[in-house]
Each structure stands twice: as C-alpha cells, then as structure tokens.
Amino acid sequence: MKTKVQLSFMMFVEWFIWGAWFVPLWLWLSKSGFTAGEIGWSYACTAIAAILSPILVGSLTDRFFAAQKVLAVLMFAGAVLMYFAAQQTQFSTFFPLLLAYSLTYMPTIALTNSIAFANVDDVEADFPRIRVMGTIGWIASGLACGFLPQMLGYSDISDTNIPLLMTAASSALLGVFALFLPNTPPKSSGKLDFKVMLGLDALILLRDKNFLVFFFCSFLFAMPLAFYYIFANGYLTEVGMKNATGWMTLGQFSEIFFMLALPFFTKRFGIKKVLLLGLLTAAIRYGFFVYGGAEQYFTYALLFLGILLHGVSYDFYYVTAYIYVDKKAPAHMRTAAQGLITLCCQGFGSLLGYRLGGVMMEKMFAYKEPVNGLTFNWAGMWTFGAIMIAVIAVLFMLFFRESDKEITAIEVVDGDAALTQGEVK
C-alpha cells in the first residue's frame, strides 16, 4: 500500500473516532439524566487529557519509541476503555472511564500529525491532502450517527450509546492498522530525565517571540471556539433545525474544499494572513448565529452559513498552525512541539472555554422561563464569543511578526534556543 494512502486512511479513522462520540454525546447524556454540569465535565475530559498526556507522550516518542507503535498501543487501550464507558449510566462511573479514554486518545492527534509529517516530501503541499481525509472521517461519523440509520429505516441513534460503541470498534481498527504504518523512529537519542518525562523540553520553543505570540493567541482562541463544540448542536436544535447532528457535518464539507486549497493560500498569502483569516471567519460565524433562526428563509440560511464557516475557520487556523509548528520546531522535537500546541488548544484553552461557557450559560444566559420557545439567550452567548475572537484577531495582527516569505526556525543547541534565519523547506 502506498505511503500516502496509508497516511490518509490513518487520518480518516483517527477523526472518525472523535466525531463519532463527541458530537452526539450531549444528546445521550441528557437523555440518560445527566445534569448540565455533569455533561460539561464530560466534555471537558478531552481538555483535561490534552493537558496531561500529549506533550509527555510526544517527548517520549521523540526519543525512545517508534510513533506508529505508540499509536497502536494507545488505540487498543482506548478501545477497551470506551467499550466499558458505553455501558455506564451514572456520572460517577462514566466520567472516570471517559477521562481515562481521553488520556489515550488526545496524544494521538499529535502522533498522527507527526507520522504524516515524517513521511511526506513537501509538508505544505502533501499534509493538507492527507489531513483532509480526517475531515472526511469526521463527516462519515456524523452521517453514520445522524442520517444513515434513518435512511436505512432504523431509529435515530444519536441519543443512544451506539456512537460510543462505534468509537470503540474504530479505535481497535486503527490500533491494528497502525502496526502496518511506515516506521517512524525517534529522532533524538537524548537520555530519560524528569524534564523530558514532563515534556518541559518543548517549552524552550516559547523563547521565540513569534512562537510565543502564536501560542498565546492559539490558547485564547480555543476558549470561544469551545462554545461551538458544546453549544452548537443544542442551539441549532432549539431554534428549529431538524437533525442538527447530521447538518453540522456541512462544516466538514466546507473544510474539505478549503483544506485542499490551503497550499495555494499559504503560498500566495503567507502563514500569518491565513491564520488571521481563520480567526476572522470564526468571529463572522458567531455573528451569523446571533441573527440566525428558523422563522424565515434568510435567518435559516444564516444558520447554514455559520456551519459552513466552521470548516473554513478550522482549516485556516488549526491546520495551518500544525504546519507552522512543524516548520518552527527542530526535527528532534517536532512530536513534542505538536503535543505542546495540543496542550495549548485542546487542553488549557478548551478546558477554560468549556467551563467559561458552562458558567456563563447558567449564570448569565439561562432564562428562568422559556422565551419564544428558547431556554437560553443564545444571541448573547454568540455575541460574547464573536467579540472575544475579534479581540484575539487584533492582538495577533499587531504582535505576530513572522515573515510571510520565510520562517525563523528555532534551533536548539545544548539546551539553549538559538535562532536560525532562513526559509524552512
């Protein structure tokens, strides 16, 4: 099997796994009697795990283990944990299992990126074409959990534990497949010490001012972005969109197009402008949600435009961010660097976003009595998110000074960070 085909299938299953349980989880837990706070903590599992595990796994993989073997072990463990999580109906038993599962899954985002980066010739041209299969995998999970069962004459499975069982089976599949991926050996022979164990060696990258600004803005952006993941399904359903779980895959359809176009945008406009465009489209998306609704064609169309812009925003910011990190980090630290950005975005940023969003919805935007059939002031929530992102975009535009034509690579020598000027191929 050709390497690019293998990497593409790896990405497909990797993101099918996450989409299968993450999007419909709210519906199943709500039906099972979990409180809003318990559901919020359940969603926060991925963020907590992203804080604890990816940078550690990345540092160890950079030095001691072949990346594809680590991926296989984590996927097999995740399959077992998710299977047992799907059997639980009480928060006290469900939460620990979901958290343990998340600890096995979140490092694999950085691992799959690193495996792909290590086995392609042209990162900017090849990676988006491989990564787009992850988007297709996420779409496939939405269709499998949303439209497909009803098209086949079955009842809706979005509010059952079947998506979690699909996740377990898919994890086992990727665990087996990972054993046949191209060998991706460690690129460093550094010794095992406490600093490496905690992944603290990757923090040296923050000495570079541009990387620090990028890291800080990525962290801030992850907070309002989390509002979409936890609230969009409930919002779209409450304002009258039928089968919102299925329709939300439109965001991934737009992601396919713009991800394939990403090499053109990065080469034509440079990484800074593409990252900035990702921020701006996210703010516009929330603006559409502020005025969206099902009462007339125009407002209903705004809902779909908002969903479509999610794919644009994700591609232009996060996929470009992965490419930027791979260019910026030295070869022996790239997996740890990918873990660092996962820690920043899916970890601390998302965790704070989930908690901030949950608290604000309960304390500021929850109606005591339904208003026009709505239980929350959704317009207020989306307005807050749009303003946050707009402020982040301004900060990024002012302080991120990386050249559009060449990247300042960070060269780590004897534990110190030195800067090497020149374009990174």
Residue ranges and their predicted role:
Residues 1-47, 210-249, 318:
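Helix-loop boundary and gating motifs at the non-cytosolic
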